[in-house]
Amino acid sequence: MAVVHCLGCGLVGAWVAKRLAALGHQVHAYDILPHRVMGIDGITVHQGDVLDNLMSMSNNGQVDIVVNMLPGDIGHMATTDLAESRYRVVDLSFSKHTPDRDNQKAQDYGASILWDVGIAPGLSNMLLAYADRAIGPLEKAEVWVGGNPTGPYGEWKYMAPFSPIDVIAEYTRPARVIRQGEEVVLPALTQRHMVDTGEHGEMEAFLTDGLRSVLKSIPAVEMSEFTVRWPGHIQKFIDERESGDLNEDELIFEWSYDHKIPEFTWMKVRAQSRNGKILEWEVEDHGGDDGHSMARATGMVTACCVEAWLKNPDMLPVGVHAPEVLGNHTISQIIRAMKLNNVRIDGPEISFE
């Protein structure tokens, strides 16, 4: 089994570290607050500033692969530093800066980086890329995704299943979309509309900046990503922002995750070809004994990418790679693993042709 170094032990990072340890890998976990992975068999904990430990990981033994699960800009700084290594890096971090700008540096140093390996972006990219290969060129591509309580609980009707800081950034960063075949920038939280989420009924969707790499890699006439929340949540955010009453420090507390409240993650990916053919997938998870739904849905994609790369060391060359470069076989493996772990995924089977 491999030696895997996991950076960041938040809700998602801890799930991935535990998952990889349960699969038999030797895991080194790094975090300033590593309490979620303390005392877990197969995990060696390194407490402290992760950025200070990046280039000394080899002092802790073999490094077969690095998994970056640090939040926001800290995660981006870690990936930028790791581009100056010879490591294989699976990068779940999310910030306004994307790792592809470090592609030349990674090639020069010999690093291989696979980025945006969550549910969306991540699995959403893979499904859109599969649709493009199967029925493309695409007329329209859309992603709806959200992790929410199962009902509109509390004043905000929301709790953050990952870093609240990243959620705030998601709500404020302008959304890059495709319109008439060209990339344009629209204000986040616009194009609000209702979407049917099945058993949870009608929820509200709005534009966010989650397309990232597919803006360049998948040609389409129109492409959008929407975040899904309970009605009333985003209007409250907008009202408090416009009145000047929005306090980000308070939001971090008010949106904190409460494991006693039932929650779910839901995603729909829809691709329409220029001749009218449609491929559509729906993903839903309600969590389990091993973690909450967003940690599971996101973490399974991350862990499966780690597993696939360990099994096939030549899966990716040096440089920086987006998830849509992964082949149909890897996508199928990820979907199969998620289904085996009771994540509902409805939609067309991934063909190997």
What are these regions (language model features)?
Residues V4-G8:
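Conserved N-terminal Rossmann-fold NAD(P)-binding element of oxidoreductases
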Residues A17, A21, A83:
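Gly/Ala-rich phosphate-binding loop of Rossmann-like dinucleotide-binding domains
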Residues A134-E353:
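C-terminal catalytic/substrate-binding lobe primarily of soluble NAD(P)-dependent oxidoreductases
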Residues S93-I113:
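Rossmann-fold NAD(P)-binding glycine/threonine-rich loop
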Residues G48-D100:
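NAD(P)H-binding glycine-rich loop region in Rossmannoid oxidoreductase-like domains
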Residues V27-G39:
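NAD(P)-binding Rossmann-fold cofactor-contacting core
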Residues V12:
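Hydrophobic/small residue at the entry helix of a nucleotide-binding pocket
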